[in-house]
Swiss-Prot record:
Domain MGS-like: 9-156
EC number(s) on file: 2.1.2.3, 3.5.4.10
Family in the record: Belongs to the PurH family.
Biological-process GO terms, alphabetical: 'de novo' IMP biosynthetic process
Protein name (record): Bifunctional purine biosynthesis protein PurH
Domain notes: The IMP cyclohydrolase activity resides in the N-terminal region.
Gene Ontology terms: cellular component: cytosol
Pathway given in the UniProt record: Purine metabolism; IMP biosynthesis via de novo pathway; 5-formamido-1-(5-phospho-D-ribosyl)imidazole-4-carboxamide from 5-amino-1-(5-phospho-D-ribosyl)imidazole-4-carboxamide (10-formyl THF route): step 1/1; Purine metabolism; IMP biosynthesis via de novo pathway; IMP from 5-formamido-1-(5-phospho-D-ribosyl)imidazole-4-carboxamide: step 1/1
Protein keywords: Hydrolase, Multifunctional enzyme, Purine biosynthesis, Transferase
PROSITE patterns, per database record: MGS
Organism in which the protein naturally occurs: Mycolicibacterium paratuberculosis (strain ATCC BAA-968 / K-10)
Domain of life: Bacteria
PANTHER family: BIFUNCTIONAL PURINE BIOSYNTHESIS PROTEIN ATIC, BIFUNCTIONAL PURINE BIOSYNTHESIS PROTEIN PURH
Gene3D superfamilies xrefs: 3.40.140.20, Methylglyoxal synthase-like domain
Length: 527
């Protein structure tokens, strides 16, 4: 072959194809199209059987190798007459000569997909059945063909079959196209290997005592969107999603509006989690990953939104709204009067959606309920921090387990507000103080480097509404001053984790103020 045959745009005609697939989707149509184009097909096992049953000419791999399938099909294609035809680099005359001397024909196309290992594991199958679904020959063929992409095109997804037939009809794939297919092929086998390695470590070689965090951590993501920029215009950014994950914000359907930005996604994620921290109908309004307002309602989602917005209308301008239930017409009408970047909900009444889409710039998303549990990843210089996701499932998150430190036991309405404020704390960046009344935040102090400033900020935001309200702190009061800031503004009951060396002083300050003070024994820092 001449040097010109290996240029990026040079096509390599397809005369011989090796096909071995577990997923038979589109197989017959592919084989028929290849045959009509004069391509010789070599195939294995059940793949060859399906092709032959349709009257399409096919050479079984055992005829090619002169060696039968053995060991229940574990050994089919692991043979020099197969892999030499895949790995011969035809840019090298000595490789072409070796094939000719051995009487081996090269393959120009490999079509392979792998045993359903992940699906088998997810089905709850036993260890032996899962092990049997670890593909050996398939990945070997895929990797061989992908390595030898100057000479071979490899396809691992039935969605690519139309492209194969188009290439066959028009002289083959270009070198640039074969490179792209090779990259996809190695990504495919990498995903497969990650799944097998993860399962093997957790199932066949677990640590003792058991741990949530394996010694080896492997994951893969797919880029699903290029974003306009990152947190700031000079930063490039993109969105990646985990194809095997529970559908979340990354898989949300956008029904209306401009493209989502990096900051839209971070705020929407915070809002979505915050709204589902509550069993009652809830609306969360978030900006810069902190709540402008969160509220629950036994009346309606519109009532919850109104109360959340009233917490801090100034900050809610340009915020992100999340509801944990269907958005009603009444709520949509209110939202349409406010500049809002994003609204996200599990559903919308048709008329509500029509109202929202009149606003050109609002982004309207529908998403599945967020999955609870799991882990969170945070890159640091030279490594990665992994932790269990902070959920409201600690012993101290149940008010039945709270300790009354001082004051009279809270009446049901006051206790409900304390529980609400405590649950909101999880969604607030530390140091966090939440003041609430009537199932709504009325003052939120967040992101302060000392707790007394967080208390002052919450009181300032709440204004006159603070008197008679309740408050929650995401961590203990290290000194009485933070609590005294709240009681001085008229807060009647407070809940905090406790655990400070000055707990007695804090409790004494609460007793002197005549308020109710509960200890949870749990903490909800967020950084």
């Amino acid at each position: 072959m001449s040097t010109d045959d290996w240029r990026e745009n040079a096509k390599r005609p397809i005369r011989r194809a090796l096909i071995s697939v577990y997923d038979k989707t589109g197989l017959v149509e592919l084989a028929q199209g290849l045959t009509e184009a004069g391509v010789e097909i070599v195939s294995t096992g059940s793949t060859a059987k399906v092709i032959a049953e349709k009257g399409i000419p096919v050479t079984r791999v055992e005829v090619l190798t002169g060696f039968p399938e053995v060991l229940d099909g574990r050994v089919k294609t692991l043979h020099p007459r197969v892999h030499a035809g895949l790995l011969a680099d035809l840019r090298k005359p000595e490789h072409a000569a070796a094939l000719e001397q051995l009487g081996i024909a090269a393959f120009e196309l490999v079509v392979v997909n792998l045993y359903p290992f992940t699906e088998t594991v997810d089905s709850g199958a036993g260890i032996d059945e899962c092990v049997e679904q670890i593909d050996i020959g398939g990945p070997s063929m895929v990797r061989a063909a992908a390595k030898n992409h100057p000479s071979v095109a490899v396809v691992v997804d039935p969605l690519g079959y139309d492209g194969v037939l188009a290439a066959v009809r028009h002289g083959g794939f270009t070198l640039a196209e074969r490179k792209r297919l090779a990259a996809l092929a190695f990504q495919h086998t990498a995903d497969y290997d990650i799944a097998v390695a993860t399962w093997m470590e957790s199932t066949l070689a677990p640590e003792h005592p058991p741990t949530t965090f394996p010694k080896w951590l492997g994951r893969s993501w797919r880029r699903s969107a290029m974003l306009r920029y990152g947190e700031n215009p000079h930063q490039q950014a993109s969105l990646y999603s985990d194809p095997g994950a529970w559908p979340g914000l990354a898989q949300a359907e956008q029904l209306h509006g401009k493209e989502m930005s990096y900051n839209n996604f971070t705020d929407a994620d915070a809002a979505w989690r915050a709204a589902f921290d509550h069993e009652q109908t809830c609306v969360a309004i978030i900006k810069h990953a902190n709540p402008c307002g969160i509220a629950i309602s036994s009346i309606s989602v519109a009532d919850a939104h109104r109360k959340a917005h009233e917490c801090d209308p100034l900050s809610a301008f340009g915020g992100v709204i999340a509801a944990n239930t269907e958005v009603s017409v009444e709520m949509a009408e209110y939202v349409s009067t406010i500049f809002t970047e994003v609204i996200i909900a599990p559903a919308y009444q048709p008329a509500a959606l029509e109202i929202l889409t009149r606003k050109k710039n609002i982004r309207v998303l529908v998403a599945s309920e967020p999955l609870t549990g799991g882990t969170e990843l945070r890159p640091i210089s030279g490594g990665l921090l992994v932790q269990q996701r902070d959920e409201l499932d600690a012993h101290g998150d149940n008010p039945a387990n709270w300790t009354l430190a001082t004051g009279a036991p809270a009446d049901p309405a006051t206790l409900a507000d304390l529980v609400f404020a405590w649950r909101v704390c999880r969604a607030v960046k530390s140091n966090a103080i939440v003041i609430a009344a009537g199932g709504a935040t009325i003052g939120v102090g967040m992101g302060q480097v000392n707790r007394v400033d967080a208390a002052r900020l919450a009181v300032e935001r709440g204004g006159d509404r603070v008197r008679g309200a309740v408050a929650a702190s995401d961590a203990f009061f290290p000194f009485p001053d933070g609590l005294e800031t709240l009681t001085g503004a008229g807060v009647k009951a407070v809940v905090h984790p406790g655990g400070s060396v000055r707990d007695d002083e804090v409790t004494a300050a609460a007793a002197n103020a005549g308020i109710t003070l509960y200890l949870t024994g749990a903490r909800h820092f967020a950084h």
